[in-house]
Amino acid sequence: MRQDTTSTLSGLASFAKWQDVLAARRHADGVVAKMTFEAFEVELGQAVRGLENELKAADLARDDVDATAVIVDGQAWRKCLEQQPKTSLSASGPLTVARHLDRPADGGKCICPLALRAGIIGGVYTPVLARQVAYRMGHMTSDETSKVVTELGLSGPSSRRGDRLPKLLSAVWASHREPWEGARRQQEVVAAEAVVVAVSLDGVMVPDKEAQRSAKATREAAKKQGWSKQCSGPAGYREVGCGTVTLDDEDAKRLDTVRYGRAPEYTKQTLTAQLDAALAAILAVRPALEVGALADGAEENWRYFERPVYAKATKIVDHGHASQPLRAAMAAYYGEQSVEGRAEYARLQILLRDQPGGADDVIAALARLARQMHGKQNKRRRKLLNTELTDFQNQRERMDDADYQERGLPMGSGVVEAACKTLATQRLKRSGMSWRDGKQAMLTIRSLQQSNRWAAAWALLSAHFRIGVIEVRKYGHLRELTLAKQAA
C-alpha cells in the first residue's frame, strides 16, 4: 500500500517540486539554501499547498458524472457540455477540475453534478473553505476576511464574494430553521447540576438603511413645513432582538447559555418562538426545573412573559434597571450632586437587593419623600419623583431580590444584555456601518458561535449542499438508473 501511494505521488508535478525544494535546501549553494528560515517556511508552505491542491483536484474529479442524462431531486437533466474546466476555491488554494454539465430537457440553467455531489457551496467554495470564511465573517468584515486569507498565503475569495456567502448560508438556515433547531436540541443534554432555567429578552438599536431613508424623508418633510425640531428617538436605527436561555446550578453558576439574535421584526415573533421552543425542550427533559423570566422594564418584553407559557415562572426585573428609577428619585429630591442623596441611594439600593420585602421599604421611603415635597417651587421635582415612584409600584411584583437570591435565581439580566453587545453591537455597529438584509446573516452566525452550536449547525448546513445524483443509462428502449458513485 505504501509503495502504491509513493508511486502515485511521484507522478505529481507538485510532489516533484516539493522534493526539489527540500533537496535545494540541503545544498550549500543556491538561492533556497541561502534563504532565511522565514523565507524557507513560506517557500515550503507554497510547495506543500501545491501538492495538497493537486491531490484535492484529483479526488474532486472523481465526483464528476459522465452520463447521457442524470436525475436530481426527481428532475431529469441531459448532458450538454463535456470536460469544462472550472476553478473551485479550497482551504489550500484554487482547484481547477474539468467537469460535465447538464441542462433540463426544455432548456434553462445548467447544473454541475460534480459540484452537487461534492457539496460545493455557492458554486465555488469547497465545504471546508466555506466554513472557515463564514466563521471569520462572523467576527470581521468581508474585506478583513479577504485580507486575512491573503495574509495566510492563500488565494481566497474576494471581498464581494465573501460578502455573499453568509447571506446564502443564512437563507438556507432560515428555510430549515425550525426542524434543524429541533434536531439540534434533541442531541443536547441538560446538565444534572442544573436547578434553574432562566429566559431573558432584550433588544439593541442598530443602524438601518431603510430607517435612515425614512428618517431623511421625515426631516425633509419637516423642513418644508418649517419645523425645527426632529422626532424623538434615534433616527435611522431599528431594534435587533436578543434572547437567551440559561441553565444555572444551585450556586447560581452558569452551566450553559443559548443565545438568539433576530433582525428587526414586528413583536419579535421569530425570536420569541425560538425562546418558547428552547424552554419547552428543556422542560420536557427536566420538568422540575425552576423557571425565571428576566427583562428590563420595557412593556413589550413583559407582554411576552405574561403569556400562559410563563404562568409558573418567577418574573424578575433586572436589578440594575430597577435601580435606575431609584437613582432618578434621589436626584429629584436631593439634587444631582448631593452627597446625602448619593448616600441614601446606596442605602436603599442595598435594602432593595438584600432585605426581604426590601421593595416595599423602598416604595414607602419614596412615598415619604414625595409627601415632604410641597409648595410651587418643588412642583417639577415632585412630579419627577412621583413618576419614579409609580415605576416602582408597577414593577413591585418583580422585585423580590432577596427572595431570588435565596432560591438561587438570577436577579439581573446581564446575560442577555451582554448578548446584545456581543451578538449585535460588536459586529453591526462598527464605525460607518449601516445594514440592509445582511443583519440576520451575521446574527445567525454569531448566535451559533457564541452558543457553542457552530459545529453542529455546520454539519446540517454542509449536508444540505451535498446532493445525490442518479445516472441514467439507456439500453435500447430500457433505462438503467443508478446512484452515482466516485470514480476509481
Predicted regions: what they are:
Residues 1-58, 99-488:
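Catalytic center-proximal scaffold of phosphoryl-transfer enzymes
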